[in-house]
C-alpha cells in the first residue's frame, strides 16, 4: 500500500511516520487521547494511492468521530487539519495579502478580495504585523470551530483556502483600524485570545473592497403601493446579499378585500405580497452560499390579516398561504395583552381604513384604537383570547411567531425622542427607529465570558471585562464610519444615531466553571453584575468618544441627554458597587455619548462555536448531542461535565450510552453525585421562570433587547400562556424569540447499546416517575393564569416542526 506525497511521488505507507506526526500534535491533551490508537484507526481506513493531504483529512475525521470519548480528540482533529492548512498556505501576511489583492476572475479581470487601502496598510506594516501574529493559536480551535472557519470564514481563491485563522483575525483588525496600527494590533490580540469576536458579517467582509460589516437591518415599507412594496423588496435583496439579517414592518399594508383607489379593485391582502418576499429570501444567499438570506416580518395583532399571518410557516393548509422561508413576528401593544387577560373583545382593522395605529404607542395607541372601535371602522370583532390561542397554537407547531412588546420597546428606548419604533430585527434583540428615509442598522460583537473566569480561585475578572468592553465599543463605533452601505438610507440612519450591539456568549459556561447551578442565587447575582459592568463600560467608552468627537447627531432630547439611563427607565437602582454611576452620569451630562444604543445580547450560533462557548446567555440544551451546520455534523460532549466525570472516575462507555439514552440529561443517573447533577441541568430541566427572571434582571442594563428563547417539554396552552404573561408583566421588550419544544415521547435510539443499559432500567423507571411528579406543577410555579382554550386540551401533544 502506498501514499502519494505533495510532490506527486509514491511512498510506502508507514505506521511510524503517521504515529510520529499524530504524536507531535498531541501535546497537552488528555491521556485518553492515545496516538497509537488513533494511528491504527487511520491505517484501517487507508486505501492504496491516497494523497497525503487526503490522509490528513482522514486522520482528522477519524479523531473527530472519537470525540465522544473525550473532547481532546476534537482538538487533535483540528490540529491535524490546521497543520495541513499551514502546509498549503503562506505564513507571511504580505504574501497572503498579495494573493488576495491580485486575484483575477475566470475572465482574467482584476477582482481583488481585499481593498487597496487595507492592502497598502498591511504591506506598509508587514514586518511588524508578521512579528505579532501567533500561529500557535490556530491550534487552539476544536474540530467543529476549524471546519466552521474553513467552510464559511477563511477567504478562498478558486475554492482553495488561502487564509489561516490568524490571518482572518488580522484582516478583520486591519479592516476596522486601517491607518492605526496600534488599534489594529490591540484588536487582533484580544480576538486571537478569544476575549471577544466580531459578528459574522464583520468576519466575512472586513478588509474587503465592499466591507459591509453590519449584522442587522430594520425597514418599514414607506407606503402601501406597488412602488413602496417593491422598492422595499429591492432593498431587502441588496442588504441580504451582503450578509445582513432583516426585520420588516408591514402593519401599514392594507388587508384582504381593501379597496384600491388607483384601479378600482380589491386587495389580495398581506400573504400574497409576503410570498414575493419569501421567494426573494430563498433566492438570495449571503456571499456565495455562506448562509441563506433571512427576513423577519413584523405585524401588529390588530391587522385584519393577522390570523393568516401567524400561520405562514405551518406545514398544512393552503400552499398559496404559506411563506416558510420568512419568520413571522408580532409587535404587540399592551392593550391586546390586557384584553386577553380580561377575556374581552378584540377588533381587527385594516390600516388603510384605520390609519396611524402603527405610529403611536402607549396611551396614544389606546386612544386612537378605541376611537376607531367606537366609530365602527373595524373589519371583524373576535374574542382576544381566541386570537391568543391561535398564536399559541402556531408557536407550538412552528416555534413562531416571535413576540415583542411594542410599549415596553418604545417606553424604554433611548431613541424614543426620534419617533415610534415599529419593529425589531431578525433575531428580536435590536430595537431601533426607522422611517421612510432611514433603514436602521446595527453592528454587533459578543464577549467570550469564560475568558474572564479564574477557575482556580473561582472568581470573575470584572476589571478585564470593562477593559475589553471599551475596546469593543470603540471598534463598533469605528465600523460605522468605515463600513460599506448598500443603501443611502442605511448610511443616513447609522451616521445619525450610531447604535451598537454588544452581546455575550458562554454565560452558562461561566456558571459551570464557577460551580454555580444555573438556578442558583450566585448565578442570578453574577448575571446582573456582568451586564451592569458591560453597560457601564460601554457608556464610559461612548462618553469618551463623545468628548473627542461630539455626541451623536440626534442626542439632544434623548433620555440620556436628560440624565435618564436604561436602568432608570426600569425603575432600578444599581447596587453591586462595581461601577461609579454618579460619576459617569456627571460626565455624560457634560459630554454626551457617541452612540444612541449599546447593549443587545444576540444569538451567537456560529461565533460561539468558533470560540468554543455555549450560545449567548442560554443554558446548555443537552450534555451530549450532534451539532449540524453548513460545514457538517459533529459530536459534542459538554466539556465541563466530561472533565468532572473523569476526575470522579465515572466516565466510561456505559455512562456515555446512559447519557445518550437519557437524551443528554444526567438527572436520572444516580451514580453521578447530586451536586454534579444539579450543576449540569439542561435547559429542559431548568424552570423557564428562572430564564425569564434572569432576562428581566439583566434588562435594566440592556438598552436594546435580547434574543430570548423559551424551551418547553410537552408545551400546552396553559404553560405557554403563563410564560408569556409572566414575561410581559416583568417588563421584557422581547417576550419570545423561538419557542423550542420537545415531546415526552422519544424516538427509538438505534445508536444506543441497550445491553449496557438493561441493569439500570429499574432505577431509571423510578427516577422518571419522580421527575414527572416534580415537573407537573411547572405552570403553577410561573404565574396563576386563568386562560384555557375552548378547542384544545391542555395536554395535547406538541406538533412543532423545525424552527
From Swiss-Prot:
Pinpoint the site Important for hydrogen atom transfer.
216, 442
One biological process term in Gene Ontology: deoxyribonucleotide biosynthetic process
Q: Name one GO cellular component term.
A: ribonucleoside-diphosphate reductase complex
EC numbers, comma separated: 1.17.4.1
Catalytic activity line of the entry: a 2'-deoxyribonucleoside 5'-diphosphate + [thioredoxin]-disulfide + H2O = a ribonucleoside 5'-diphosphate + [thioredoxin]-dithiol
Q: Disulfide bonds, which pairs?
A: 216-442
Q: Residues at site: Interacts with thioredoxin/glutaredoxin?
A: 798, 801
Q: Which GO terms describe its molecular function?
A: ATP binding; ribonucleoside-diphosphate reductase activity, thioredoxin disulfide as acceptor
Q: Which residues bind GDP?
A: 215, 425, 429, 604-607
InterPro entries from the xrefs? ATP-cone_dom, NrdE_NrdA_C, RNR_lg_C, RNR_lsu_N, RNR_R1-su_N, Rrm1
| Site entry: Important for electron transfer | 737-738
Residues given in the record as dTTP binding sites: 224-226, 241, 254, 261-262
UniProtKB keywords: Allosteric enzyme, ATP-binding, Deoxyribonucleotide synthesis, Disulfide bond, Nucleotide-binding, Oxidoreductase
Q: Quote the catalytic residue positions.
A: 425 (proton acceptor), 427 (cysteine radical intermediate), 429 (proton acceptor)
Superkingdom is Eukaryota
Could you tell me which CDD domains the record lists for this protein? RNR_I
Question: What influences the activity of this protein, per its activity regulation comment?
Answer: Under complex allosteric control mediated by deoxynucleoside triphosphates and ATP binding to separate specificity and activation sites on the large subunit. The type of nucleotide bound at the specificity site determines substrate preference. It seems probable that ATP makes the enzyme reduce CDP and UDP, dGTP favors ADP reduction and dTTP favors GDP reduction. Stimulated by ATP and inhibited by dATP binding to the activity site.
Binding-site list for ATP: 5-6, 11-17, 52, 56
Instruction: Name the family the entry cites.
Output: Belongs to the ribonucleoside diphosphate reductase large chain family.
- Binding partners and assembly: Heterodimer of a large and a small subunit.
Function, as annotated, reads: Provides the precursors necessary for DNA synthesis. Catalyzes the biosynthesis of deoxyribonucleotides from the corresponding ribonucleotides.
Instruction: Name the chain's protein.
Output: Ribonucleoside-diphosphate reductase large chain
Tell me what organism the protein belongs to.
Cryptosporidium parvum
